[in-house]
């Protein structure tokens, strides 16, 4: 097996791992109740896999071009198909994330009128205004 074939096989394995992580991301975003630490872990996994993929791509570009090799062409075609599938999946996950952000914004907007305004007092410290009552100090 040539060095280029080994690199392409490694790229394919990383893409498979990336699909697994993106499947987890999709399931997590579809649940409706988001666990921030779980989503952060998924994001870190994706970043790590993408960095590995970038490194392998740099190695691949340094290898001599053997475009006429059927074996290499088949491997590259598989990588291209996987990459296109992952791009579509990433776009779908992005839509799910945007929907979640929008729901969070709506929830915050609903809570905003019920939040007591925070004001600065004469001493420069924050204080909240009290509604409907008198503040008495002795």
Curated annotation (Swiss-Prot):
One of its GO terms (biological process) is bacterial-type flagellum assembly. Pfam families: FlgN. The keyword Cytoplasm applies. Gene3D superfamilies: FlgN-like. It is found in: Cytoplasm. GO terms for cellular component: cytoplasm. The keyword Cytoplasm applies. Residues 117-138 are annotated as: Disordered. SUPFAM superfamilies: FlgN-like. InterPro entries: FlgN-like (IPR007809), FlgN-like_sf (IPR036679). Keywords: Bacterial flagellum biogenesis, Cytoplasm. Its main location: cytoplasm. Required for the efficient initiation of filament assembly. Belongs to the FlgN family. This is Flagella synthesis protein FlgN. It comes from Escherichia coli (strain K12). The gene is flgN.
């Amino acid at each position: 097996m040539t060095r280029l074939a080994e690199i392409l096989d490694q790229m394919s394995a990383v893409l498979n791992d990336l699909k697994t992580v993106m499947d987890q991301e999709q399931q997590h975003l579809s649940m409706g109740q988001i666990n921030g630490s779980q989503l952060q872990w998924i994001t870190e996994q994706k970043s790590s896999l993408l960095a590995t993929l970038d490194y392998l791509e740099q190695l691949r570009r340094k290898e001599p071009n053997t475009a006429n090799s059927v074996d290499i062409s088949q491997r590259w075609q598989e990588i291209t198909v996987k990459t296109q599938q992952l791009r579509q999946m990433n776009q779908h996950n992005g839509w799910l994330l945007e929907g979640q952000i929008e729901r969070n914004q709506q929830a915050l907007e609903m809570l905003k009128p019920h939040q007591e305004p925070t004001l600065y007092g004469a001493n420069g410290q924050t204080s909240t205004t009290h509604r409907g009552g008198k503040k008495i100090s002795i």
